[in-house]
Structures are given as structure tokens and as C-alpha cells.
């Protein structure tokens, strides 16, 4: 229900599908990459132009493989290991690009904030904690027990005190702003 409310059209759950991109700790399984590619194409009709890669070692080979010829793999982390490995033939022979990203620079951050102020995008919080509970909030993130974003109130005793455009907030709607919380995030 949460994903439907966010407008997600298709989801492939790696765990539920049982993908094993590594046959053992030294050998990747190209057959599993092909299976993932087939599943992606079944949902969207083509190979993806852009693949957002987060886990790192466990999935980089598959991400490079399924990315469309001339497409881009964007990596923004490496939670499953920083030492990635992939078959370079699937990279250079198909003219793919690899882009590293760590969110944004100052100008991009300013533009993202501007889009928030215009109501074009809405940051979705699953939980907000008082400053005294920062340790618990960090522990929740460290254990990956959260969905979406978590906020910490630094200079405010309660939520809502930083709202400087109530009309925009009303236009966006509390139901959209609190979407993750309503779904038990």
C-alpha cells in the first residue's frame, strides 16, 4: 500500500526472488544477472537507462550488466562492501558510464531545497525524535530498522514549529507529508 501511494509501478524484491549474484565469494553468477535483467524487462519493457546502485560488492556486477547500452550506473554507497567487482566487457563494450554520487554539492542542495519550498518534492519522514533520543535514532538507522528518513528536533521542543509556509503545507496535504508514518514506517 505504501508503494502504491508513492506512485511506484513495479518492485523487484531481491530476497523474495532469491537472486544470488555470487556463486561463491570469488565467483559471480552471470546467469543470475540475466534472470534479473529478464525480470526488469518484464516490468518496464526494456533495460534501464539508469541504475542506482547502493549495496556495492554484492550487486555491482548485476547493475553494470542490466544497464542499457549507453546507460549509466550511479553508485551512492557500498553497504555490502566497498571493493566492487564486475565484468568490464559489459561496461566498456556497451559504452556504459559509472558515476559516483554522494548526494549533492552546495548548488544542487540549494536547488533541491528550492523544489521542496515550491512543493514540487516532499521529504517523507517516518519518525521524528527529540534531541535527547538522538542515540536511539542513530541506532535505528545503524540496524536498518527504519523506512524513509528520520528527523531529530535540534532547537524545537515539538514538531511543526519550523513551518514557515502553512499554505504550502496545506496544499501538499498532511496525508502526503505523513505517508510513511501512516504505513507504520
Segments (PLM) and residue ranges:
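Short, acidic/turn-prone active-site loops that include or flank metal/cofactor-
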Residues: 14-20, 77-81, 103-104
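Glycine-centered, small-residue-biased loops immediately flanking beta-strands
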Residues: 71-72, 96
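Helix-to-beta-strand junctions that scaffold the AdoMet/dcAdoMet cofactor pocket
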Residues: 67-68
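Rossmann-fold NAD(P)-binding glycine/threonine-rich loop
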Residues: 78-95, 106-112
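Short SAM/SAH-binding signature in class I
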Residues: 48-52, 71, 149
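C-terminal hydrophobic helical "lid"/dimerization subdomain
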Residues: 35, 46, 61, 106-185
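Terminal peptide-recognition signature
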Residues: 3, 51, 63, 98, ...
